[in-house]
């Protein structure tokens, strides 16, 4: 498959075969995620982060450098010319003359799509508001493939927390629809998965459960995908306080789950997963975070036309 110069904006843009192709390349690159290679020697990737990020920004930075490339960019809007009034469009037009690819995180939904329509080099969406986060989804699927005893198509996946504002769960739901996985959505009423996504999944013929009770789904879940409540997306702090701390996984919570059930989280966590869970056999969120490096190495090498 040819991904050279292709933009990575949304999981909706990919077929199952294309996703599997990316994950297969990630598996081949995983050994190099610690020791490195030189296939991107001389290449420059711009990482433009208008919102705070730890894992995504640093794992992209690591991925580029493990491939032998270098990075330029900024880690907040405050350190860019945005503070002087420069538009995103103008920034993209400038940066695409400096770099061979652009990794963009922006608070505005649709920003990455707009950037891709302007840029002369591949744009990789590292999160656009409450929209999409495709490389997070790819590493989530890679984690399920590596850590679960079942194939992705046979999994029961419980997605828990902020399903309204959480872009990671939007992207993940679309991707899991390609595999026919069974999905359970657990959230407070005011943070339910958007109706447009539910309707999309139903048209795909997926088995979907919506509930506000975590206990309803724990017994049958192969994957418990926890998310934090997206405080920064709430227009009213009082509304956030009403739902903060709604769901929390503890060792006691996990007493009734299957022996092979895994707990995932895109991180950062607040209080959704007790620290004591880290030592249990179910915890996979730190390994999940590491998998971001080989997956992003795979994405970068593909869009930049590097043969591995």
UniProtKB/Swiss-Prot annotation:
UniProt enzyme class: transferase
Biological pathway: Pyrimidine metabolism; UMP biosynthesis via de novo pathway; (S)-dihydroorotate from bicarbonate: step 2/3
Annotated binding of carbamoyl phosphate, by residue: 55-56, 105, 133, 136, 267-268
Binding site for L-aspartate: 84, 167, 228
Keyword line: Pyrimidine biosynthesis, Transferase
Biological-process GO terms, alphabetical: 'de novo' pyrimidine nucleobase biosynthetic process; 'de novo' UMP biosynthetic process; amino acid metabolic process
Any one Gene Ontology cellular component term annotated for this protein: cytosol
Highest taxon in the source lineage: Archaea
Catalytic activity reported: carbamoyl phosphate + L-aspartate = N-carbamoyl-L-aspartate + phosphate + H(+)
Its EC number(s): 2.1.3.2
GO MF term set: amino acid binding; aspartate carbamoyltransferase activity
Role description: Catalyzes the condensation of carbamoyl phosphate and aspartate to form carbamoyl aspartate and inorganic phosphate, the committed step in the de novo pyrimidine nucleotide biosynthesis pathway.
Family: Belongs to the aspartate/ornithine carbamoyltransferase superfamily. ATCase family.
Quaternary organization: Heterooligomer of catalytic and regulatory chains.
Name of this protein: Aspartate carbamoyltransferase catalytic subunit
Organism, as annotated: Methanocella arvoryzae (strain DSM 22066 / NBRC 105507 / MRE50)
Species classification: Archaea, Methanobacteriati, Methanobacteriota, Stenosarchaea group, Methanomicrobia
């Amino acid at each position: 498959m040819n991904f050279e110069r292709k933009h990575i904006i949304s999981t909706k843009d990919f077929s199952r075969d294309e996703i599997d192709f990316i994950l297969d390349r990630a598996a081949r690159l995983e050994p190099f995620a610690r020791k490195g290679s030189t296939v991107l020697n001389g290449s420059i990737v711009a990482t433009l982060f208008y919102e705070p990020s730890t894992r995504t920004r640093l794992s992209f930075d690591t991925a580029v450098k493990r491939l032998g490339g270098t990075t330029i960019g900024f880690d907040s809007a405050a350190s860019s010319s945005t503070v002087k009034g420069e538009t995103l469009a103008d920034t993209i037009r400038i940066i695409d003359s400096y770099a061979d690819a652009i990794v963009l995180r922006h608070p505005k939904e649709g920003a990455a799509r707009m950037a891709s329509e302007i840029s002369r080099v591949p744009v990789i969406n590292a999160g656009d508001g409450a929209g999409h986060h495709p490389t997070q989804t790819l590493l989530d699927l890679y984690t399920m493939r590596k850590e679960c005893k079942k194939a992705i198509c046979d999994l029961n996946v419980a997605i828990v927390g902020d399903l309204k504002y959480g872009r990671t769960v939007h992207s993940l739901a679309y991707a899991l629809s390609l595999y026919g996985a069974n999905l359970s959505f657990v959230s407070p009423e005011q943070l339910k998965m958007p109706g447009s996504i539910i309707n999309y999944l139903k048209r795909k013929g997926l088995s979907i459960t919506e509930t506000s009770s975590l206990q309803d789904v724990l017994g049958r879940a192969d994957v418990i995908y926890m998310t934090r409540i997206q405080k920064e997306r709430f227009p009213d702090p009082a509304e956030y306080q009403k739902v903060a701390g709604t769901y929390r996984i503890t060792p006691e919570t996990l007493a009734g789950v299957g022996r092979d059930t895994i707990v995932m989280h895109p991180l950062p966590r607040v209080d959704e997963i007790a620290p004591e869970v880290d030592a249990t056999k179910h915890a996979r969120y730190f390994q999940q975070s590491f998998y971001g490096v080989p997956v992003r190495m795979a994405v970068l090498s593909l869009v930049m036309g590097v043969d591995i």
